[in-house]
C-alpha cells in the first residue's frame, strides 16, 4: 500500500490485497487481487476519523452462484486516551449484508509493544492480538478472532514501512 498526507489534517491511502482461497477438492482454489482506497482526517491531536472502500470491482471468488469477495464501506474513528491507550470504533457495510458495528482497544505497556482486543456485531466476533514494532520500520502483528459462524481465524502480518 501507499499513503500520503494531502494537508496537515487529511491523508489518503491506496492498497492492493492478494487473496488465496483453498478449499477441499470439490471446491478447488481461487486467487484474486482487490484494491482499497481510504481517507483519514485529523480532527484534533487525539481524534482521527477515516473512511475506506474495499473491492469496488466485486472480484469473483468462484463461479458457483456468482460468489464474490466482499465489497466493504467503512467509517471508523480512533481516539488516543493517552500515549498508552487507544479506543477504536467502526461502522462497516458489506454490500451483501447488514451493517456491522466494531469496537476495540489497544494498550501499549512498553515502547513498541501492543496488546489489542475487539468486539464486533452481526455476526458476533471477539478478537485479540499483540504487536511488536522495531527500528521504526518493521511491524509484526499476530492475533486471532472468534466468529460465531466460522469459528477461529488466526491472523499474521509483517509490515515494512518505507519512507
Report each predicted region and the residues it spans.
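Outer-membrane beta-barrel porins/channels
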Residues: 1-163
Amino acid at each position: 500500500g501507499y499513503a500520503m498526507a494531502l494537508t496537515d489534517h487529511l491523508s489518503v491511502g491506496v492498497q492492493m490485497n492478494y487473496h488465496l482461497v483453498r478449499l477441499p477438492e470439490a471446491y478447488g482454489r481461487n486467487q484474486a487481487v482487490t484494491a482499497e482506497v481510504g481517507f483519514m482526517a485529523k480532527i484534533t491531536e487525539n481524534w482521527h476519523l477515516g473512511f475506506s472502500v474495499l473491492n469496488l470491482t466485486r472480484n469473483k471468488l468462484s463461479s458457483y452462484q456468482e460468489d464474490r469477495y466482499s465489497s466493504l464501506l467503512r467509517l471508523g474513528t480512533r481516539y488516543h486516551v493517552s500515549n498508552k491507550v487507544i479506543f477504536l470504533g467502526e461502522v462497516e457495510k458489506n454490500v451483501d449484508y447488514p451493517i456491522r458495528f466494531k469496537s476495540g482497544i489497544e494498550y501499549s505497556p512498553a515502547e513498541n509493544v501492543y496488546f489489542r482486543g475487539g468486539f464486533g456485531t452481526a455476526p458476533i466476533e471477539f478478537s485479540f492480538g499483540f504487536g511488536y514494532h522495531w527500528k521504526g520500520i518493521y511491524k509484526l502483528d499476530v492475533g486471532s478472532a472468534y466468529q460465531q459462524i466460522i469459528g477461529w481465524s488466526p491472523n499474521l502480518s509483517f509490515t515494512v514501512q518505507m519512507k
